[in-house]
Amino acid sequence: EIGVRLVGSEMCIRDSCNTAGIERFPGAQFDMVRLGIGLYGVSPIDNSIIHNVSTLKTTILQIRDVPAEDTVGYSRKGHLERPSRIAAIPIGYADGLNRHLGRGNAYCLVNGKKAPYVGNICMDVCMIDVTDIDCREGDQAIIFGDDLPITVLSDKLDTIPYEVLTSISTRVKRVYYQD
């Protein structure tokens, strides 16, 4: 009978907390809670109770030196103001990387450092600026994960983490771990 109360002649379960409520109001959890986005390791209030459970990462395919004043990507939208090292990574809008993140609006992490997206996000690939990052072809690029929360992307897109997560295409390989 845990979680069940008799109200009049009917039984009811009391539940008033979503993920944020679980974190903020432990005394108001009553009979059960609705973890929601917390199942994906996302905390709406940036608390240390919930830990990240997902990472989206890829590897650097190619790195090229590009002179200042040159352009990168479709429609020449990536205009370089300085000589740059530009890396291509195999993820694009067909994989769920939103095109609005391109043109310097967001970044991924390469060896723990911010690598801004350069030019438009293409269908299968995008370019990142690794000029100030010690890296090589084959190194990882973290789109979101422990050190780059998915909320950084959702905030840049003026949306919610659910939309970012559900936009990841089925063509992206999933690897599941169990402790």
Each language-model region and where it sits:
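Single conserved hydrophobic/aromatic residue that forms the stacking wall/gate
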Residues: 1-13
